[in-house]
């Protein structure tokens, strides 16, 4: 049995979010939350929120034991990019890409 949680259109770069995902992939849920709590990155708090949501979904919707849960899969896929323009010298303008992510967490019960 597995439980999922997703956060879509999160205003964090998928590359930066992916680095944080690599830290907790395969870990126990409580251990992963402890790691994320002390990780000094902006994406860590967002990912922690999604992991907590997956844990709550497992407990309430699937009646799974929260002590045995581990992160089976965690990915930060690329969402749509917002394009903004920044004025530069001599009448030019450059694009600034504000990237978004779709974060998906799947938790399973250890046997």
Curated annotation (Swiss-Prot):
Alphabetical list of Pfam families matching this protein: Ribosomal_L22 (PF00237)
MF terms in GO: rRNA binding; structural constituent of ribosome
Assembly and interaction partners: Part of the 50S ribosomal subunit.
Annotated GO biological process: translation
Keyword Cell membrane listed: no
Tree of life domain: Bacteria
Family classification: Belongs to the universal ribosomal protein uL22 family.
Record-level GO cellular component terms: cytosolic large ribosomal subunit
Gene: rplV
NCBIfam families: rplV_bact
PROSITE patterns recorded: RIBOSOMAL_L22
Keyword line: Ribonucleoprotein, Ribosomal protein, RNA-binding, rRNA-binding
Known role: This protein binds specifically to 23S rRNA; its binding is stimulated by other ribosomal proteins, e.g. L4, L17, and L20. It is important during the early stages of 50S assembly. It makes multiple contacts with different domains of the 23S rRNA in the assembled 50S subunit and ribosome.
PANTHER family found in the cross-reference section: CHLOROPLAST 50S RIBOSOMAL PROTEIN L22-RELATED (PTHR13501), LARGE RIBOSOMAL SUBUNIT PROTEIN UL22M (PTHR13501:SF8)
Name recorded for this polypeptide: Large ribosomal subunit protein uL22
Keyword Plastid: no
InterPro entries from the UniProt entry: Ribosomal_uL22, Ribosomal_uL22_bac/chlpt-type, Ribosomal_uL22_bac/org-type, Ribosomal_uL22_CS, Ribosomal_uL22_sf
CDD domains documented for this protein: Ribosomal_L22
